Structure formats: C-alpha cells, structure tokens
C-alpha cells in the first residue's frame, strides 16, 4: 500500500511527545513489510541543523490563498522518504509556539491534501492528532484516498477560530467543532495508542467532552499499542550503559546501579531500593500524587530516588526542595537526556509511573526492556503493558494500583520495596518483563490489519506479500 503519514512531529528531528516517536519509527517497520510509506512534515527552521535538505523544492502549490513549496529528503537513520512543507510561517519557530497554531496547522494540512491530490497520491493518508484533523474532512469525498486518524492524546484537541470555517470550506454542520472532532467523524478508521484508552475515552471521565461522538463511532474505533525500537534500545549492546546484560546474565546489571548512583550523587549501596522516573513534570503523569507521598516514603524506608524530566515550574521547585531534604538519597535532574534516561532504566530497581491518565506510555516499556520493575496505576496503556506481580503463580511484570489516591500509591510502593528483598522472586519478575515483546514490528502488523480492514481485505499472512500484489488488491477493491 501507498501510505502518507502527516504529522507535526517526527523523531529524531522534530519531537516533543510520544507522537514524534510513533511517526519517526512506525513508517520504517511498515516499509520493511513491503509498503511504500512516506512522511509529510512542516519545514521547521531548526531542521537544517539536523539533516540534509535540498535547496530546490520538488513541487510548489497553494492552499488557503498562500503559496508553499515541498522539499524532499530522507528521515535520518532510515530509508523513509520525507516531504517537508515549506512556508515562512514555520521557519522562525519551535514546533508549538504562538497563538496561531490553528491557522498554521490547518494551512499545513491543506497543503498536505493538495500534495496528495496533485503530486504523490497515496492509498491512505495516516493523520496524527488535531494538527491534521481537517484532512479526513477534505478527503471524505475522494473515493481514491482513505484516511486513518490516530488519537495520541485526546486532552489536546486544538484551537479553532470562526474564520477558519470560511477559508477551509468547512461544511456548515461542522461549524463550531474542533479539528479533533472533525477527524473522528470523517476518518475511515480511528485508533488510539492502546486498547484500554480506546475504551476509556468513550466515558465522561476520559472523553474530554467528545465521549458521545466517540461512542457513536465506536464501530470504527480501535486501539493499537505503540512500540519501542528494540534494536536501538537493547540492554545487550547499549553503548550508553556501564554494563550490558541479558536475562541470562542479570547479575551483571548491578554494575549499572552502582555506576548510576555514582553519576547522580546518591550513596553507593547496591542493596538500597533505587526507584527511577523519567517523565514530563505535569499533572497527567501523577506528579501531584508523588509529591504527596514521597517525603513519607523516603522517611519510612531506605529507598533512593532519581528523577529526570522537565515541566511545570511548581513541580520542578517541589522536586528540588525534596532532593535538598534527602541528600544522597534523592537526585533531581530537570532536563531531558536520552543517554541518562537509558542509564536510569538500566540501573534502577523499579520505575515509577502513577499516571492520572495514559494513552499508551513508552517509559514503562523501556523500563521493562531494561529490567527496571514498573510501579504503575492501572489506566490506559499501562493496563495493556504491565500486569500485577503474582508471586504464588509466578506471574506478572510489575506492581499496579487502581485508585488515584496517595494512600494507594504509597501502599503499592511499599509492596514493591518489600518484594525487592526476595531476590530470586525479584529476578524472575525482571526476567518476565525483559521477555515481553514491545517491538514496533508487532505494532506494525496491527496497523497493516487496520489499513486492510478499510478495504475489506483479509488479514495479511505472516510473510508479507510483495507490494505490487497488495497494491493490486487495493486497486481492485476501489474499482
């Protein structure tokens, strides 16, 4: 199939959140399965510092009474063709800035639609989050191009001002809607990034005022778990950690713990229960819950804590103050560093992720991959990726709690701290987590099933068919 990914982010060149990880990784694995997948991305002003971009565009067009140019390159580290939407409105900016994001990304989306109609015509346009929400509306009347819309985080639905209804030729019955709602209504298929989150957003507690619409279209709504690049993030050969290891050489992992304690200024003690967290410091991630119990937890136990992340200034200040109260037992790094995050995954005993809500989550999969036992709240993708430790039946991969309450989190952390004392059971718990399959190839197969379901095609066999055969099947289904 010919598939065009349209998004505001794509790792490693333009990333703010999890959407960038998906758009930067999934196309690579879909191409390995025989599909012609390409990415359409804004030409941000900072991109020339990160990659090679030709000076001359491959195509020029106009949208919303503005001219634009499209430049062709390749996503670094892959063979995925990358089309960059060039216009001055994106050049001097960060990815998200200013109060005109609705106009900028609607203009970008209109440009992507014009590009698909006039230059490279895909079978499917795969749209990501509110920034691309108008594309399914415009493509709804085109029998040759279908759309898939992925909701990465329903909480961000995008602004929408009245004048956009006029210059985008928005149907009268969509007036007043945001672009997220428009995409949900008009896309051929809608998916979220985990099965549990797909169910949760149909309820008032998680639906962000769209639960009625999402329930109405539930027949075309599904959830597919994100993946991680298991070739890049592999404790067996990761050059950023002190000691590589596998499930068979788990005892070697202790060297990473000692190296991490030395690096971040914690007391070097291999027997201390070391908890890590790599996150954005925002309410969604349960930071308010952590702040309510962390002082008590560190006072009650001999545990250590290391945090890596940035976010709300209030949360940053509170974490700094806690670290100053527990020198040698708590380390706070208010930044993001990929290499340090890997050392935290590889060197901590447990990983804390008590999210208020979590569409999918990547960190818990990374922690499992590197043998750090996750402590999570049962919500969204955390339900689908972490199962509660059951020592009697030698089952489970982490410690889970249900209610978003300080006492519930505290109790769960105490159970993990106590479980850490039983080394044979703890190592078996680590091994089960490290053996889980969170590869992007697994996720890619689910997306292929979703794409094929649009055309009523049967599920693809394990050995992917040649692209030409599949393209012929898609063409026949349209005729």
Curated annotation (Swiss-Prot):
What EC numbers are recorded for this enzyme? Answer: 2.4.1.21
List residues traversing the bilayer: none
User: Which Gene3D superfamilies does the protein's record reference?
Assistant: Glycogen Phosphorylase B
Q: Which SUPFAM superfamilies match?
A: UDP-Glycosyltransferase/glycogen phosphorylase
Q: Which GO terms describe its molecular function?
A: alpha-1,4-glucan glucosyltransferase (ADP-glucose donor) activity; alpha-1,4-glucan glucosyltransferase (UDP-glucose donor) activity
Any one of the GO BP annotations = glycogen biosynthetic process
The record's CDD domains line, in alphabetical order, gives: GT5_Glycogen_synthase_DULL1-like
Quote the catalytic activity from the record: [(1->4)-alpha-D-glucosyl](n) + ADP-alpha-D-glucose = [(1->4)-alpha-D-glucosyl](n+1) + ADP + H(+)
| Protein's pathway | Glycan biosynthesis; glycogen biosynthesis
Family, according to the entry, reads as follows: Belongs to the glycosyltransferase 1 family. Bacterial/plant glycogen synthase subfamily.
The record's section on HAMAP family has:
Glycogen_synth
Name-wise, this protein is Glycogen synthase
- Identify the coding gene: glgA
């Amino acid at each position: 199939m010919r598939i065009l990914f349209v998004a505001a982010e794509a790792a490693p060149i333009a990333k703010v959140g999890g959407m960038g990880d998906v758009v930067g990784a999934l196309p690579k694995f879909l191409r390995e399965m025989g599909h012609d997948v390409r990415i359409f991305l804004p030409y941000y002003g900072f991109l020339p510092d990160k990659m090679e971009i030709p000076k001359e565009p491959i195509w020029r067009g106009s949208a919303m009474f503005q001219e634009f140019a499209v430049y062709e390159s390749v996503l670094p580290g892959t063979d995925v063709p990358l089309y960059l939407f060039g216009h001055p409105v994106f050049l001097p900016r960060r990815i998200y800035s200013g109060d005109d994001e609705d106009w900028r990304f609607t203009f970008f989306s209109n440009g992507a639609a014009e590009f698909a109609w006039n230059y490279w015509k895909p079978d499917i346009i795969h749209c990501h989050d509110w920034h691309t929400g108008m594309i399914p509306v415009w493509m709804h009347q085109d029998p040759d191009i279908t759309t898939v819309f992925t909701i990465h985080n329903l909480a961000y639905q995008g602004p929408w001002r009245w004048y956009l209804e006029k210059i985008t030729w928005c149907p009268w019955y969509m007036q007043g809607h945001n672009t997220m709602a428009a995409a949900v209504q008009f896309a051929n298929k809608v998916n979220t990034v985990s099965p549990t989150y797909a169910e949760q957003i149909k309820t008032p507690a998680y639906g962000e005022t769209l639960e009625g619409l999402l329930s109405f279209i539930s027949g075309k709504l599904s959830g597919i778990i994100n993946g991680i690049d298991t070739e890049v993030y592999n404790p067996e050969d990761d050059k950023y950690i002190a000691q590589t290891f596998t499930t068979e050489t788990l005892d070697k992992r202790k060297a990473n713990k000692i190296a991490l304690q030395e690096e971040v200024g914690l007391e070097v003690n291999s027997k201390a229960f070391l908890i890590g967290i790599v996150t954005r410091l925002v309410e969604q991630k349960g930071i308010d819950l952590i702040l309510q119990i962390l002082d008590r937890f560190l006072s009650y136990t001999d545990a250590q804590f290391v945090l890596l992340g940035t976010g709300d200034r209030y949360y940053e200040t509170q974490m700094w103050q806690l670290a100053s109260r527990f020198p040698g037992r708590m380390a706070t790094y208010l930044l993001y560093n990929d290499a340090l995050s890997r050392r935290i995954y590889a060197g901590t005993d447990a990983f804390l992720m008590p999210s208020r809500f979590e569409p999918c989550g990547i960190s818990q999969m990374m922690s499992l991959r590197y043998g750090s036992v996750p402590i999570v709240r049962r919500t969204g993708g955390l339900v689908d990726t972490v199962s509660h430790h059951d020592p009697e039946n030698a089952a489970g991969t982490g410690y889970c709690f249900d209610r978003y309450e300080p006492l519930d989190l505290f109790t769960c952390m105490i159970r993990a701290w106590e479980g850490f004392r039983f080394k044979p059971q703890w190592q078996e718990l680590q091994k089960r987590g490290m053996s889980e399959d969170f590869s992007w190839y697994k996720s890619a197969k689910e997306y292929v099933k979703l794409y094929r379901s649009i055309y009523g095609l049967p599920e693809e066999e394990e050995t992917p068919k040649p692209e030409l055969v599949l393209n012929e099947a898609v063409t026949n289904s349209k005729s």
